[in-house]
Amino acid sequence: MKIQRKPEWLRKKVPQGEQAAMRGLLSELKLNTVCQQALCPNIAECFGCGQATFLILGRDCTRQCSFCNVDKAPRPQAPDADEPRRLAEAVLRLKLSHVVITSPTRDDLADGGAGHYAATVAAVREVSPGTAVELLVPDFGGDHAALATVLAAQPSILAHNLETVPRLYEVRKGADYQRSLDLLQQAALRAPAIPTKSGIMLGLGEELDEVRAVLQDLRRVGCSYLSLGQYLAPSKRHQPVVAYIPPQQFDLLRDEALALGFRHVESGPYVRSSYHAANYA
């Protein structure tokens, strides 16, 4: 496959901010971020203004998604029982009004890490009760009891990314489109006061009508919030980019999604699921 050259609209200017302070805090508290692990293109912007998406439950994922830069391992390290406290301290010291917390998929754990998510929410609420806590969770292998554990912690937003259209789900090793959709539906049914959110990457070879069908599926299961962004391959070893989607198409899809009833939509080439996360709350 011919390697696509990045168009002009993806030549992002890197802002100069106080990144060193953020990196120092993360190092001091021994915390991971998906910003660093996934090579997020917005890391300079977010770190520069004191924002980060925290990665709990270790740095290793038990699945082999071909688009993702997070490390893989069949048996990652056991959860760090002190991690929730340290993350809460970071939230307090950064004075965050909105925090996003995610994790690798942990199929090796009986509850998929749900209890650790709940403990982290509780720790943040104890020291910073006014902070909105958004959780971006894996599919927990379809375990409804694990989902119930997370919902019982009462996060401000429960997010789970569909990532792409059903036809291309081979890039999500071990995942299932219907199972992911069911998680969002179950969350909306079990805890209607907690809004749900999902994200889709464009540029993997999907057709526009396939994306529209996914948006309709999300609204059918009660999903409130949506992010749409351009897939960028972390390296030549990862899933290649099939197409660079022009900004005008992101604008079109945002307008169509809002017309379907999504409460808030972030749509653009550099949008990621936690980018401008406070705009959803």
Swiss-Prot record:
Q: Which residues bind [4Fe-4S] cluster 1?
A: C35, C40, C46, S274
Q: Which NCBIfam families match?
A: lipA, PRK05481.1, PRK12928.1
The cofactors required by this protein are: [4Fe-4S] cluster
**Under the GO molecular function aspect, what terms does this record hold?**
4 iron, 4 sulfur cluster binding; lipoate synthase activity; metal ion binding
* Free-text remark on how the cofactor is bound: Binds 2 [4Fe-4S] clusters per subunit. One cluster is coordinated with 3 cysteines and an exchangeable S-adenosyl-L-methionine.
User: Which superkingdom, per the lineage?
Assistant: Bacteria
The Swiss-Prot or TrEMBL record describes its family as follows: Belongs to the radical SAM superfamily. Lipoyl synthase family.
Keywords of the record:
4Fe-4S, Cytoplasm, Iron, Iron-sulfur, Metal-binding, S-adenosyl-L-methionine, Transferase
Give the subcellular location.
Answer: Cytoplasm
Pfam families linked to this entry? Radical_SAM (PF04055)
By its UniProt entry, which HAMAP family does this protein fall under? Lipoyl_synth (MF_00206)
One GO cellular component term noted in the UniProt record for this chain: cytoplasm
Stretches of the chain forming a coiled coil according to its record: none
Q: Which InterPro entries match?
A: Aldolase_TIM, Elp3/MiaA/NifB-like_rSAM, Lipoyl_synth, rSAM
This protein's pathway reads: Protein modification; protein lipoylation via endogenous pathway; protein N(6)-(lipoyl)lysine from octanoyl-[acyl-carrier-protein]: step 2/2
EC id: 2.8.1.8
Question: Which transformation does this protein catalyse, written as a reaction?
Answer: [[Fe-S] cluster scaffold protein carrying a second [4Fe-4S](2+) cluster] + N(6)-octanoyl-L-lysyl-[protein] + 2 oxidized [2Fe-2S]-[ferredoxin] + 2 S-adenosyl-L-methionine + 4 H(+) = [[Fe-S] cluster scaffold protein] + N(6)-[(R)-dihydrolipoyl]-L-lysyl-[protein] + 4 Fe(3+) + 2 hydrogen sulfide + 2 5'-deoxyadenosine + 2 L-methionine + 2 reduced [2Fe-2S]-[ferredoxin]
Protein name listed in UniProt: Lipoyl synthase
Q: Which organism is it from?
A: Trichlorobacter lovleyi (strain ATCC BAA-1151 / DSM 17278 / SZ) (Geobacter lovleyi)
- Boundaries of every Radical SAM core domain copy: 47-263
Quote the record's binding site residues for [4Fe-4S] cluster 2.
C61, C65, C68
